[in-house]
Structure formats: structure tokens, C-alpha cells
């Protein structure tokens, strides 16, 4: 109905401290169910079985078609602070973990982000600047401040060396938290200047969000200068021109 030739399912890899991740014993069942769907609908649509692996996770990623590498936590002195659970939890992390210095938190976030591929063996990089989830209108920090920019661009440069593409993620827009995708339009300009590759992702947690505002963000990417987007297939990446 939406015109997709393929679809990727991905759940969060098990984490001891979080109830919203898969339980370890559920992973084989999840993989089997997605494989069954792939077989059932193979003549209509290609279905891949993926996983979103946080940089702090130590779980294996074996048995998946692809891995999304992401950062949801910043670690400081043995404590883990979630950046995307709620504004209150973010504020707690800024206060308790970083002495009220939000730029120290964003710097640590991007230090971990820089290692997300080496930590997760990611197929692609998910929501690169997730730390901005609750920062609409510069609520907590200025994304053009040099302290933020230097940390973000350092991470971007490190990840570009891995050759992995960056997703343009519309999930925050769908949830009404952001007016721009992840990465922000400014960071997408930086990515284009560095000849990075992109793909589109709606980070869907429900059917209604599938492909959310793809046409709009694809047009924005084209205006920035991107000529194509990548699409992940069973046999690897395919590149499609932005029209």
C-alpha cells in the first residue's frame, strides 16, 4: 500500500537495566517469527530481520540481517544516563552526572557515538544526534555552539572512516518532539560536505509512522546536495537517485 519493495523489522537488543528491550530468551522467537514472515510474503515484499544495538550493550548480534548502531546512554563514573527517555531523566543526567554542564554531557554522548560502529559492528548509524530529542527550540543547549559542534563533527569524522551510512530518521518528527529529522539539517549539510552516504528511516513503533514525511526529508536532502539514498537489500546496499 505504501509502495515499499522491502521492510526491515528491528527490536532493541537485551539490556539488563531496561524493560523495553527484548528479553534474551525472546530473541530466537523474534528471529523465527520474522523469518516466517519473510518466507510467507517473499513473492510480495522482501523482509529483513534486524536489531538495534546500543553502544553500551555487550549482547551478541549474531543471526540478524542488519544492525543499527545507536547511542541512548552516556556513561560517567560507572553510571548510565539515558538521553531520550524523558526531559526529566535528561535533566537528572546533566545535573548528577555532569555537574549541570550540558555541553559536558553532549561531548560524552558524541565520544560514545564516535565508537558506535566499533562497539556494535553496525550496518548503519542510527539517529546520530539523538541527544537533541528534547532540545527543540534550544531548550537545553545551542546546537550551533562550538562546544556542541566540535564534538558532533569529531564523531561524524570518526564514523565516516568506517564507511557506514547515516540514517535520516523521522521518528522524532512523527512523535511531535522535533521539527527536523535526525541528524539535523545543519549536520546533514556537514555530512554532505564530507561525502557521507544516507538512507531513510521512520524509526516506526507503529504502522501509521511507516515512511513518515519521507518525501519531505528526501527533498531536503536533495536541496542540501545529496544525489542519492541507499536502500538495504538482502544482498547488500543499493543506491537510488533522488528525483
Question: Which role does the model predict for each range below?
Answer:
Residues 1-3, 46-48, 65-68, 123-125, ...:
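Structural preference for beta-strand elements that scaffold enzyme active sites
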Residues 1-88, 99, 103-107, 209:
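A metal-dependent hydrolase metal-coordination microenvironment
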Residues 133, 138-243:
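Charged catalytic cores and adjacent phosphate/nucleic-acid-binding surfaces used
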